[in-house]
Regions:
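Conserved beta-strand positions in the Rossmann-like core of class I SAM-dependent methyltransferases
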Residues: 156
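Short hydrophobic core segments
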Residues: 63, 74, 84-98, 132-135, ...
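C-terminal, flexible cofactor-proximal segment of oxidoreductases
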Residues: 243-365
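Glycine-rich dinucleotide-binding loop and its adjacent helix/turn
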Residues: 21-26, 32, 36-43, 49, ...
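Short beta-strand/turn micro-motifs composed of small residues
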Residues: 136, 159, 248
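FAD-binding beta-loop-beta segment adjacent to the flavin cofactor pocket
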Residues: 1-13, 104-109, 215-245, 253
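Glycine-rich active-site loop/strand segments that organize a redox cofactor
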Residues: 1-46, 233-239, 276, 284-309, ...
Length: 365
């Protein structure tokens, strides 16, 4: 996590609904509306303390294997060695920002430039005076292109949607937006898909996402196919063993509220408060969703990207489990925050956003 990292969401939008991101919950009123990573950590620690969560966590315990045989049998490696324990249900919340995803680019074996993934990036200091190429056009690629440009002599920002990215870096004269990479050359140059050559570069930075990994689960339960986790109902529940839920798989979302409704949905299902469709119906829903995405030209590795669909996804889970739908202000603020980024792509975190959500105390200018 790099030192200057800040959220790309206003904190009144990203908070858990029953725990505001200010002094009435887990924050400080004077913090910026787009807080830094240390402030997000503070908020989460306050949340854990407020709801006595720490005492329910077993720290320094690694799950080596999880198998189902009437109950879930977990082999856990802890401070006192390994042991197997039994549980009625299993919720996997191991995240998906740990194992970097680096594309296999022809020529990479003999490419002389240093290569690093954004997962290991900390600051631009090590790029002073360099020619740098950055691969990846999502939030991390945008942030790193702007930050590294302050130190580097030149930054080549490579990937799709070249025209759409120009506004994000137009204020930086040493950032050049380029198309996708075709191959890497042994003299440090890079060949783009249109056969254009750029460089040579001193460093290549991958802001290309992460892999989903569940090494403790058998593949007969969960498979990962080009970063699509299947077979799941509602991007959440294992169809073949519905006492297994995977919380937090979707991306391009407002995380904490989505995690919250997923957890409530699973808890209420386990408690018998609503029934599931038959396994065949859940498979049909999963297959129909995949076909819808495929027909829309969505790559399989992006099937878990919700983006603007996340509001309907939340309400769908809420309706199914008998919870309240999103409050009226939530979608409005989410869409306003999106427009805010489009209006101020290079500096949106420091510009005033005049749409407000839940009562949250933060600087008003």
């Amino acid at each position: 996590m790099h030192a200057s990292l800040r959220t790309n969401l206003p904190r009144d939008l990203m908070a858990f609904f029953d725990f505001p991101f200010d002094s009435s919950g887990g924050g400080i009123d004077e913090w910026p509306r787009y807080p830094g990573h240390a402030q997000v950590l503070y908020y989460l620690e306050e949340f854990a303390d407020a709801f006595s969560i720490r005492q329910r966590i077993r720290f320094n315990a690694k799950v080596l294997q999880a198998v189902h045989d009437d109950r879930w049998l977990l082999t856990i490696d802890g401070d006192n060695g390994s042991a197997t324990e039994a549980f009625d249900a299993l919720t996997v919340c191991n995240g998906h920002y740990t194992e970097p995803r680096v594309p296999d680019i022809p020529g990479s074996d003999h490419f002389p430039a240093s290569c690093v993934h954004s997962h290991n990036y900390r600051s631009p200091d090590g790029f002073a005076g360099m020619q740098v190429a950055i691969v990846g056009t999502a939030s991390s690629g945008a942030d790193l292109s702007q930050e590294i440009a302050v130190a580097a002599e030149r930054v080549y920002w490579c990937g799709s949607e070249k025209a759409a990215r120009l506004k994000k870096t137009e204020h930086l004269k040493n950032v050049i937006s380029c198309g996708p990479i075709r191959s890497l050359i042994d003299d440090g140059r890079i060949e783009l898909e249109d056969r254009t050559l750029i460089g040579p570069v001193d460093s290549l930075v991958f802001a290309t996402g992460y892999h989903y990994r569940f090494r403790f689960l058998s593949e007969h339960l969960i498979q990962v196919r080009d970063n699509w986790v299947t077979p799941l109902y509602q991007d959440l529940l294992c169809i073949t063993q519905p006492t297994l839920a995977l919380i937090g798989l979707p991306f391009k979302i407002i995380p904490f509220p989505i995690f919250e409704i997923q957890a409530r949905w699973f808890a209420r299902m386990l408690n018998g408060e609503f029934g599931l469709p038959t396994a065949s119906r859940m498979h049909e829903a999963k297959d129909s969703r995949a076909e819808q995405l495929r027909s829309a030209g969505i790559l399989q590795r992006n099937y878990h990207a919700l983006d603007n669909e996340q509001y309907d996804y939340y309400d769908r889970l809420a309706q199914e489990c008998g919870d309240s739908p999103l409050p009226d202000w939530y979608r409005e603020l989410g869409q306003a925050a999106r427009r805010h980024v489009q209006r101020w792509p290079g500096c949106f975190r420091d510009q005033f956003l005049d749409v407000h959500g839940a009562p949250t105390r933060y600087p008003q200018s």
